[in-house]
Amino acid sequence: MNKISIAVIGAGRIGAFHAKNLASHHKVKVKTIYDLNSNSAKKLANVLNSNVADNDKEIFEDKEIKAIFICSDTPSHIKYLELSHLYNKHAYCEKPIHLDINVVEKFLKKIKNHKNSIQLGFHRRFDPSHQKIKKILKSKKYG
């Protein structure tokens, strides 16, 4: 069975969280990890049996990689989203895209006709309804 090759940019807490979840899926191969801190990238790559990119562009130029998980610092998100657009990759980006709404609006206009998916991670773990469900589940009242 062919696996989809994915790269993760950012090997910190959230990058490692996503990379490990992705690697647990039978149809996914976390092929490459990139982080400005090469030690963090190497540590995560060792756990996942992945490659480490020497630079960010290496990920985008790799034709096997179909999707990019952007888990780096917020100021770099637009750069990596634009590269995803340029290299025609699917992208998942941690929130926020950028801190300046004008930059976000300009980017959204630029990618209006992007052929692949771009998804923004917007977890709701602090949403009151999610907190209530979590509390109920932990109580084991319903199984």
Please tell me what each predicted stretch does:
Residues M1-L48:
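N-terminal Rossmann-like dinucleotide-binding module
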Residues H25-H26, D62-K63, D127, S139:
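Acidic-histidine catalytic/liganding microenvironments
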Residues V30, I65-I68, Y142:
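Local beta-strand N-terminus motif with an aromatic residue
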Residues D56-E64:
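Short amphipathic alpha-helix with an adjacent loop that forms part of the alpha/beta core around
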